[in-house]
Amino acid sequence: MAATATKTIDFAAERALAKDFLANFAGPRGEPKYLNILQDVANRKIRAVQIELDDLFHYKDADDEFLQRVTENTKRYIGIFADAIDELMPESTEAYAVDEDRDILMTQRVDEGADGGADGTDPLQRMPPEIRRFFEVYIKAFSKVTPLTIRQVKASNIGQLVKISGIVTRCSDVKPLMQVAVYTCEECGFEIYQEVTARVFMPLFECPSQRCKLNKAKGNLILQLRASKFLKFQEVKLQELAEHVPKGHIPRSLTVHLRGELTRKVAPGDVVEMSGIFLPMPYYGFRAMRAGLVADTYLESMSITHFKKKYEEYELKGDEQEQIDRLAEDGDIYNKLARSLAPEIFGHEDVKKALLLLLVGAPHRKLTDGMKIRGDLHICLMGDPGVAKSQLLKHIINVAPRGVYTTGRGSSGVGLTAAVQKDPVTNEFVLEGGALVLADMGICAIDEFDKMEESDRTAIHEVMEQQTVSIAKAGITTSLNARTAVLAAANPAWGRYDMRRTPAENINLPPALLSRFDLLWLILDRADMETDLEMARHVVHVHQNLESPALGFTPLEPPVLRAYISAARRVVPSVPRELEEYIATAYSSIRQEEAKSNAPHSYTTIRTLLSILRISIALARLRFSETVAQSDVDEALRLMQMSKYSLYSDDRQRSGLDAISDIYSILRDEAARTNSMDVRYAHALNLISRKGYSEAQLKECLEEYASLNVWQIHPNTFDIHFIDA
């Protein structure tokens, strides 16, 4: 049996190849890409040098074998590229902030000839290259390679550069990791260096220098922490995405080590794509005795790519900015954006508008005395089964850059807020954020809200108004940020809405929680011949063609929606003084209507006034306007009325009023309230829209009562003048 020939690798030649690539690779404009990066490193502008395999692939002088060796033995080649960078590192061309301790120590070491100590032969006295370097080398995987799932990473990938996708479930604190330990001998005074390549190491106690050996002295070594080199270190748990888990299995997770500039780049709940080196991690101590030859594995991260950027991280490119400018000039953009949300779901136009405003939100306000007023909108969708509440929730989480979806029965109080757990690395008690904390600066969707235990539901009260989670457990007393918009879906108390009972009995939520929702949307499933026929056609079309029917325009894709919303969220509109009285009057009229009603449809408090302001500001943001217009306030009031539209229609049926008579009553009451004989058409349309009537019904009412000489209609503006108010 012939022995297989093994090819010896000349690492000096490999370093020459790496040096040639770094020195000669040109960017898209012909500029020396990596030499420019090294100049920024020398000027202390950046620390990370990221070498992309895509560039190595396109470099004319790099062969495929070299590329394969870099991919399969990445840890070794990081050192080779670092040595090549040491040789190519240019002198600094700009003044930079001096790191006093480090620079003084380095200057002193060079002046004293620390490179070699007493006779230059002792390896422990030679200054390691790591302690000289003020840069970090990362090798980024191919951009077009399909990422593996955690389940697909096998033992054959050990030592290789792999790309993995998953969701971050846990992040440890950032801690210092020793890279080079520096000791000083009490006898000879020399510096002794010890490179640390693992998580644990055995410190040196006796001086190994030649002078101490010649003097037969056992010099005592003192660890110099200020002179040693530390690296930022963070441990992260990456879990399989739900769509990658086979049937009947639980998601697997992988430990990821982040070092240096890659720390603090992810947070729990982020869906990311990581490229890194898959490495074994041997057990230590008693665990090693029991484990035998078995080792744990981890991923040493080289690059991190977020699937969905946060709104504030969006940097609009030229073509995206032009597209947003074109959309902003469209007079019907509000309707188009709303209809682009879940176009496969039939109808629910006003619900989609409310959900669009939830995504946009209003800016948080902080008063001079430190009090905060939230800007996030909270919406509860309550309705009969089968009206697509859960599908709307899932779609909003898909569109939002940061979103967490959970269900009422599957969530406990600590699962929503925060739990105290023991850190496996440090054995300390640490806080682990729940769904509401994970959704900080995003959206938390809670399905089956009515099925939650009352004790668990009360945990949400503080989050919805103060937007913090206060904890006092296991000796930890703190507050966590939970600046999240809550989107809840619930069924009425008896499964379906019972018209024989009052709204309060059907809704079955405590007033303390009810008042915290900006909009409580009641969606009732009523039999209607025309609507049911249209819906059935729509559902059959979606089922057959896997897409929504034509909407009259091309729906905007989620990335475009995110870009538009991120641009809108940068606007901070203000409410002009002339609208203050108008908003106050509208709020007081809502309170009066509720006081007159025997069974009020909602629970109106001063929070309702803040809700009107938040919705109005979100509408102004969509128009990229710096000030709130009256039309924004009118639309906010209309959405509040339309959320209870199905109940108003039943009230009208019970009272025996038809649409025409009810519209006449609304206009007559308005004329009496303002003590005026005239009502503008635009104002009349706004009034009846709030009650759920259409413009066609208003025109029919105007014509009918004009023929009875109750009022006169202006031929051009359609303004109303009462003949006898």
Swiss-Prot record:
What's the domain of life for this entry? Answer: Eukaryota
State where the protein is found: Nucleus
Keyword ATP-binding carried by entry: yes
Its BP terms in the Gene Ontology are: DNA replication initiation; DNA strand elongation involved in DNA replication; double-strand break repair via break-induced replication; pollen development; regulation of DNA-templated DNA replication
Residues reported to bind ATP = 383-390
Q: Which residues form the MCM domain?
A: 333-538
According to its UniProt record, the EC number is 3.6.4.12
Q: Which reaction does it catalyse?
A: ATP + H2O = ADP + phosphate + H(+)
Per UniProt, the keywords (alphabetical) are:
ATP-binding, Cell cycle, DNA replication, DNA-binding, Helicase, Hydrolase, Nucleotide-binding, Nucleus
Reported function = Probable component of the MCM2-7 complex (MCM complex) that may function as a DNA helicase and which is essential to undergo a single round of replication initiation and elongation per cell cycle in eukaryotic cells.
What is the name of the protein in this document?
DNA replication licensing factor MCM7
